[in-house]
Structures are given as C-alpha cells and as structure tokens.
Amino acid sequence: MAEKKTLSKQRARSILHAASKKIVLVTGDAMLDQFIWGEVDRISPEAPVPIVNFKRESFMAGGAANVARNLTSLHCSAQMHSVIGRDEAGKKLRILLKDDHVDCQSLINSNSRQTSCKTRIIAQRQQIVRVDREAGLDLESQLSKRLTKSIETGLSKSKAIVIGDYGKGIITQDFLNKIKQLGKLHDAWLSFDPKPVHSLDLSELSLITPNRKEAFELAGICDSTKNPKPLKDKNLIRVTKQLIDKLGLKILLVTLGELGMLICQPGKKAFHIPTLAREVFDVSGAGDTVIGTFTMAIAAGADPIEAAILANHAAGVVVGKLGTATVTPKELLDSFN
C-alpha cells in the first residue's frame, strides 16, 4: 500500500481495531512515577524556596512501563519484560501495571536492584522539583539471560518490540545485541527510545525516536541554528540523513516539541507533522506515548506516515493532561474532529 500524507478518522479507527488484536513486547527501564500535589502561598523563611502545602499524592507506571500502559490504554495487548527491585516501589509498580491490564509475567523481581522512582512535586499546575531514587547499575548477566529468554518466548505471539532506554541499567550493549539477533530471527519490528549519554550501537534497529537535542547528540553535531520550519532547517535535515545512513534505520522519528515531529526514511524526503496540542500542561511521558502508539500502528498494518500521524494525535492528547498520562481510543479518535 502506498504511503499517505494524511490519515482519516475512519482509517485511524481501522488501525485501532486491528491493534486490539495485536501484542507488543516492551522492555527497558520500568520505573515508578510518584506525584505529590499541593499549593504554594508563601516562600520559606529558611531559604528562598516555595512552601508546598500537601493536598494528595498519586502513583503511575513510568519509563518503559509507561509505554506498556499507553498500549493497553489503546486496547493493544502489552507484555512487560524488565527487572525491578523486591521493594515497596516494585510492589506498587506491579499492582499499577496489572490494574492497567499489562501482562507482568516477565516482570522480574530482584534483591540486587532498587526500583527506580521519580517523585515530582506539583503546585499550581506546574512542576516545582523532581527527586530521583535509583541504583543505575548495569543488569547482571544472569538476569539479562532470563529477560532474553522471556522475550524470545514472547516473539512466538508478537512481531514488535519497544525498547526503552532511560539510562537505569536494564539496556546494556550485550542485552541490546541479543534483542537485535532475536529481531532478525523472528522478523520483528524493533523500536528504540535512545539515551545519547548511554553510548550504544543503535545500528540495525527499525525505528529510533530521539528528540531534537538527542538527535544532534547521537550525530555528534552541534545544534547551532534552529529554523521554525523544520524542513528548511539545514542542520536538522543533515543530522537526520547522517543518522539514517550511519545506523541503517528503517525510520527515524524526531520529536520537536511545539514544532511537532519529523519522520525520515531512507531515500525519501523528510515529512513534517505539525503539533496538534492546543494546551500543554505536562510533557512527562509524551515520548512514551509516541513510541508506543507508532509501534502499535505498525504492528496493526499502518504505513510509517500513518503511524506517525496517529502518534502525533496521541501525543497532542496526553500533553494536555497533568501527570504521566495515557490516551484512550475515544480521545484519540475525537482528536480527528
């Protein structure tokens, strides 16, 4: 089927229907997101910082786990393949994922790891500060082998994997190489959310989804100019071509914040998709929504342009919500009105 430059609501509905019968495997750093909500009405006499009056707290699955819950929110089945600690944060994360209908049979608890937890303090609809609790140790060889085996088993039912690298130690080069080998063996689609400071060989992947800053870092090029029209941004286009050629990617999807996203394919002109967000309250986890929705759409038979447009619509919905949010099929289809 020839690639389209637009996506109708009817076609989006058809993709979502097909996706409801698919399974996507998710691996990488599964984290717990804690939100403390409060109000600020004065500055502390102890230091020039706001005093937040506590109102409530909430917890959500974060990192690669947020990709999984974004998939199930869209009625696509998701398997979580990761390692978390045998601690309270790990227990809470597992419960949250099960509540979100994520398959957690391959979510391994380990005494040697701490579950990564990000605590965000929010007042007046703005994030005041974030506190990170994490070990960041590389995954032990034995646990890596267990994860690899579980992914291999999962590929008997799925042909798509999302790999979320948040620099917390799950994604090592050895583990990534094994996933690539399995991808080749099973002809599976491999989507990767990169962390440039975590230097890895990203060749032979189907898709990577860096933001602008990450794309320039991956290419080793200084981002000295920025054109409000991405297709006329010579430096950006140069970076995308270099990454496509260097890594042998099928798709490069660069997220550009308020400028939308740029989808690039070998031998084709880059295609710009403007943002659809009307109001932006919180970008936490928006990248997870993009990579999850795109991969789900590809698994459901969408072409890359259709998948990118659908992912852009999904991102436009979640950034209008506070917290690590997801989008439902109804919300996604309503965004086409």
Which ranges hold each PLM region?
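Active-site metal-binding loops of divalent metal-dependent hydrolases
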Residues: 30, 166, 289
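Conserved phosphate/ATP/ADP-binding segment of small-molecule kinases
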Residues: 169, 173-270
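Structural motif
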Residues: 25-27, 130, 159-162, 191, ...
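Conserved post-catalytic alpha-helical subdomain immediately downstream of the catalytic base
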Residues: 242, 246, 250, 276-335
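Short acidic, glycine-rich surface-loop motifs adjacent to enzyme active sites
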Residues: 157-170
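Conserved phosphate-binding/catalytic loop of the ribokinase/pfkB sugar-kinase fold
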Residues: 107-113, 120-155
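Positively charged, low-complexity intrinsically disordered leader regions
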Residues: 1-41, 336
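Substrate-binding N-lobe of the ribokinase-like
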Residues: 5-15, 45, 49-116, 332-335
